[in-house]
Design a protein with these regions (language model features):
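Residues that define the transmembrane beta-barrel architecture of outer-membrane proteins
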Residues: 5-7, 64-68, 116-120, 158-164, ...
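Short loop/turn motifs that connect adjacent beta-strands in outer-membrane beta-barrel proteins
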Residues: 18-23, 77-83, 133, 173-178, ...
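Gram-negative outer-membrane beta-barrel transporters
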Residues: 90-93, 110-194
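C-terminal beta-signal and adjacent terminal beta-strands/loops
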Residues: 133-136, 185-195, 218-288
């Protein structure tokens, strides 16, 4: 639509030292483009009669990102189990950005390439097999993403500065058909604005997101370690698991968005819309 000609060169390299075969290093770089889609082409403006109209911006350009990524993986054994520690650091120089704001559940785009910015951070993740064939993991991330709108530096709508997550699964002693899993998340709140306002006019952050889920699953049909094939109707199934979960175990009220109320003095107040509280779930998983 905008008649752009794009070239996206990319390169990556990996290295495993002979003296440390359990360590793998990698580096990647490249120039990436994101072509605009319909909602980003919409350019609102006011005509001579004061009516707001929408036109399509044919001169808009693709958003561009130059990326540098450095990572490493290290495998080892502990407690008689295999583990892998992964780490990654990245920097992304962003240009020709199309700013957008989130109004409750609606995303409103500026319709023009008005800003530039960056995203940088580090990620760490530890994998481990406490249960053979099933990964448990622990992750931690730090990130900063910022853009310049009209000479004012503001966080991007996805600026979640920290995040911690875990997933752990294990069997009960002497009950190999009964499996327990635990999931937890703690992450920073996202930037928020009042309706019809942009972040360069002011913003605030939602509270941190916190959630813990637990689950139990019982194997009604599990693979036979001896390799003996089942007979009858059960021979059609590889495994059947019946499980029960408690989502948001601690009943934490996490904020999803805000509903704005205006009083007679034209002052706006942010009323939080909360996500689902504690919830129970029953599931049946069948593998053929």
């Amino acid at each position: 639509y905008n008649k752009e000609f794009l070239v996206s060169p990319r390169a990556s390299v990996g290295f495993v030292p002979q003296s440390m075969p359990r360590l793998a290093l990698r580096f990647a770089t490249g120039l990436y483009y994101q072509t605009p889609f319909f909602k980003e082409l919409r350019l609102p403006h006011t005509d001579a009669e004061g009516n707001e109209i929408i036109t399509l911006n044919s001169s808009i350009k693709s958003q561009r990102s130059f990326q540098l990524i450095l990572g490493a993986d290290y495998t080892f054994r502990a407690f008689g189990r295999p583990f892998k520690l992964s780490g990654e650091a990245y920097y992304k120089a962003l240009s020709n950005l199309i700013p957008y704001e989130i109004d409750n559940l609606k995303i409103v785009y500026a319709g023009q390439n008005l800003s530039k910015g960056f995203a940088s951070g580090i990620d760490f993740k530890l994998f481990g097999q406490f249960v053979p064939g099933t990964d448990s993991w622990l992750s931690f991330s730090l990130m900063k993403t910022q853009e310049d709108i009209g000479g004012i530096k503001v966080p991007r709508p996805t600026d979640r500065r920290y995040s911690f997550a875990l997933f752990f699964t294990d069997y009960f002693p002497k009950l190999p058909k009964l499996k327990f899993n635990l999931r937890g998340v703690l992450s920073d709140g996202l930037p928020m604005t009042a309706p019809h306002e942009s972040r360069d006019k002011g913003y605030f952050r939602a509270p941190a997101y916190k959630r813990v889920d637990v689950g139990l699953a019982y194997g009604l049909v599990v693979p036979d370690a001896s390799g003996v094939r089942r007979s009858g109707f059960l021979r059609h199934f590889k495994s059947v698991w019946l499980g029960v979960d408690v989502f948001n175990l601690l009943g934490i009220s996490n904020v999803g968005s805000y509903y704005w109320v205006t009083d007679v003095n034209d002052i706006q107040y942010a009323v939080p819309n909360y996500l689902t509280g504690r919830q129970f779930n029953v599931r049946l998983s069948v593998e053929f």
